[in-house]
Every structure is written in C-alpha cells, then in structure tokens.
C-alpha cells in the first residue's frame, strides 16, 4: 500500500510537533479504496480507522480515512489527529483513559489553538 503524500506530510508534521515522535514511523496513511470490498464498507459511516497493517509488508500500521466524510480540511486533520492518538496508544485503549490523556496532552501542547496547524483554522 502507498500513503497519500499530503496525508503523510501532515502525519509527520503533527507527529513531530505535537506528539513529539510518539506515533510510529512505519505507517501508511491513505484514503479508503472503494474497491476494497466489505472490509471498507464503513467508509460512508466512519471518518477513519487506525489499525495494524496486515496486508502491507512495508508498514506496521495504517490509518485509512474516508474521502467523502473528510472533505473539509479541518475535519480531515481532526480525523487524522484522532487516529494518531490511537496509534500513540498502540491501539491499547479505544476511547478510554489513555486516549483521553493523549487528547489532553495535545491540548496542552497547543494543537487546538487557533493557527496551530494552519492560519485561520482551529481544530475541534
């Protein structure tokens, strides 16, 4: 599998600036492929998914995002950050205390401040 270059650039920047490198480097960040069949039927319901990359020998992890639901930049980046938190916890904590700890830490590091990632935009 191949990462979307723009999504991967955002992933790397956010990982460096706000996660301080806590998210894995060996990750494929891509849009869902409508031809993937049943495993991606969620694309019209869910914004994204972080998982272990089982079909890809080049990457250990993957973030797959729904293109139809992530059209706006702010939604797209919010989804990416959400899925990155799952990777930072190594998928050990769905939306529990570890996830919340990361969300709070990212807030303290300024990710939710106006202009933190793009001029004129605020996440969440």
Q: Where does each model-flagged region fall?
A:
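Walker B catalytic acidic pair
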Residues: 83
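Active-site-proximal or metal-binding-adjacent scaffold patches in catalytic folds
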Residues: 1-78, 87-124
């Amino acid at each position: 599998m191949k990462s979307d270059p723009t999504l991967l650039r955002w992933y790397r920047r956010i990982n460096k600036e706000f996660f301080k490198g806590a998210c894995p480097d060996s990750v494929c960040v891509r849009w869902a492929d409508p031809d993937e069949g049943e495993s991606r039927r969620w694309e019209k319901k869910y914004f994204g998914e972080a998982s272990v990359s089982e079909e890809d020998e080049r990457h250990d992890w993957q973030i797959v995002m729904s293109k139809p639901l992530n059209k706006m930049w702010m939604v797209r980046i919010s989804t990416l950050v959400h899925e990155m938190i799952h990777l930072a916890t190594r998928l050990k904590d769905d939306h529990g205390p570890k996830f919340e700890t990361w969300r709070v830490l990212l807030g303290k590091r300024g990710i939710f401040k106006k202009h933190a990632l793009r001029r004129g935009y605020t996440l969440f």
